[in-house]
């Protein structure tokens, strides 16, 4: 019987445990989670802050007791793995409730410790990050108890944008700052203009090339010299992998602290696997490394690891496409493929179309901007981006499937659209991209 230890019990770890149990009813599975909660919906957290999702039970899928009762998997929360001895095949675990440590042996070790939010040096009682359910509940309680009215959001990634929208939805007066003009970095910068338009339409204050200098109580001094008072600060300034404890082992980390894995999600040590935000792998459609800390990859990794451990060695990870999407007020911004800063590795062309999301004569139409990048020689698709109030998600998902199948830009003329006036055009934007490229 295989004894499996899993480090981390959120998207990657909990899903991996479930998938293993689905295929293997006999092995002992123990999951260690350093925080309070397991199996919660990370992506729901900003909407919980905004009271868009009001019921905590909709965010939390399982408690440890429920997980054990349904799947016979032991989950120990407030238990942090602080050391790995891969030669003896043991982990050292710190019980945060008793402050005692103990060793646990394993046959197979699966690492899904995730990432932690970077922090500013504010040393402030009004400054928070949004990384887990505890963070979110703390922010929610703080806003309610202090009757917070003015909020400062720092950073311009997905979390910051979603929290900004949800704090505004909750009725707070929000100010947004970022240290540069490069926002929402997975999107082409000129296609981010709707973000600014939505901000200005709602009279939300924003400043780029701005940072916090220091915080004194509620008084925030900025690098520009401005001084303002806030009731709440949300820091969304990136993340770093929770891999410090792995340095005690022979598991290889790259220079940024991520774990390189192979097509089976194995580390350099065959009986140690890794998945989720802590890993780096490769793109599916181009020959480049890829670090994609998004939910799909964690779930795919969980399935592949489970298949491998059950003896199905024919299923492998074929790589990321980096498909991503964010809602910001009335707009959807989505992209797939390599990142904008990776285009420099290719000799490419770009084609774009700006057209209504569906037939112009049908009520409720709105503009949709679609852009596709392809290699000049092979004409293979390498990146696509879409922005609009309607239809951006559909087009990007179609192009994701096209990339998955190594389609060329010319193949897009053959895409057969599901056409009716409320949904599309007889000649869809994706078709037009193909025709324009010819």
UniProtKB/Swiss-Prot annotation:
Its cofactor is FAD. It comes from the Bacteria. It catalyses: NADP(+) + 2 CoA = CoA-disulfide + NADPH + H(+). This is Coenzyme A disulfide reductase. Keywords: FAD, Flavoprotein, NADP, Oxidoreductase, Redox-active center. Reduction of disulfides occurs by a thiol-disulfide exchange reaction, but involves only a single catalytic cysteine residue that forms a stable mixed disulfide with CoA during catalysis. It comes from Staphylococcus epidermidis (strain ATCC 35984 / DSM 28319 / BCRC 17069 / CCUG 31568 / BM 3577 / RP62A). The keyword NADP applies. The gene is cdr. The lineage of its organism: Bacteria, Bacillati, Bacillota, Bacilli, Bacillales. InterPro entries: CoA_disulphide_reductase (IPR017758), CoA_disulphide_reductase_staph (IPR023536), FAD-bd_OxRdtase (IPR050260), FAD/NAD-bd_sf (IPR036188), FAD/NAD-binding_dom (IPR023753), FAD/NAD-linked_Rdtase_dimer_sf (IPR016156), Pyr_nucl-diS_OxRdtase_dimer (IPR004099). NADP(+) binds at residues 151-166.
């Amino acid at each position: 019987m295989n004894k499996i230890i899993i480090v981390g019990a959120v998207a990657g770890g909990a899903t991996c445990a479930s998938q293993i149990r689905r295929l293997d009813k006999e092995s002992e599975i123990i999951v260690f989670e350093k925080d309070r909660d397991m199996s919660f919906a990370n992506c729901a957290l900003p909407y919980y802050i905004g009271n868009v999702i009001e019921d905590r039970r909709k965010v939390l899928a399982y408690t440890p007791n429920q997980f054990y009762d349904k799947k016979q998997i032991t989950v120990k929360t407030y238990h942090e793995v602080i050391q790995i001895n891969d030669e003896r095949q043991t982990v050292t675990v710190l019980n945060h409730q008793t402050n005692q440590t103990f060793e646990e042996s394993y046959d197979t070790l699966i690492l899904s410790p995730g990432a932690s939010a970077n922090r500013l040096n504010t040393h402030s009682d009004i400054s928070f990050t949004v990384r887990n359910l505890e963070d979110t509940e703390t922010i929610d309680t703080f806003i309610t108890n202090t009757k917070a009215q003015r909020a400062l959001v720092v950073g311009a990634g997905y979390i910051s944008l979603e929290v900004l929208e949800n704090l505004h939805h909750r009725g707070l007066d929000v100010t947004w700052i970022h240290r540069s003009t490069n926002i929402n970095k997975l999107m082409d910068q000129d296609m981010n203009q709707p973000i600014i338009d939505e901000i200005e339409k709602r009279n939300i204050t924003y400043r780029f090339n701005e940072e916090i200098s220091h915080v004194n109580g509620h008084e925030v001094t900025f690098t520009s010299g401005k001084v303002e008072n806030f009731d709440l600060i949300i820091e969304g300034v990136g993340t770093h992998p929770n891999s410090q404890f792995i340095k005690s082992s022979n598991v290889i980390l790259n220079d940024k602290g991520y774990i390189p894995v192979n097509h089976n999600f194995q580390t350099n040590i065959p009986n140690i696997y890794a998945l989720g935000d802590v890993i780096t792998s490769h793109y599916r459609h181009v020959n480049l490394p890829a670090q994609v800390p998004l939910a799909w990859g964690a779930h795919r990794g969980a399935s592949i690891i489970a298949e491998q451990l059950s003896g199905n060695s024919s299923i492998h990870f074929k790589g990321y496409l980096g498909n991503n999407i964010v809602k910001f007020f009335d707009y959807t911004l989505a992209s797939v493929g390599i990142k904008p800063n990776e285009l420099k590795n290719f000799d490419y062309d770009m084609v774009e179309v700006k057209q209504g999301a569906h037939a112009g004569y049908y009520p409720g139409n709105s503009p949709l901007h679609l852009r596709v990048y392809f290699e000049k020689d092979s004409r293979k698709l390498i990146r696509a981006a879409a922005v609009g109030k309607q239809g951006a998600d559909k087009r990007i998902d179609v192009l994701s499937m096209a990339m998955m199948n190594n389609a060329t830009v010319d193949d897009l003329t053959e895409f057969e659209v599901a056409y009716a006036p409320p949904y599309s055009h007889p000649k869809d934007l994706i078709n037009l991209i193909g025709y324009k490229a010819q």
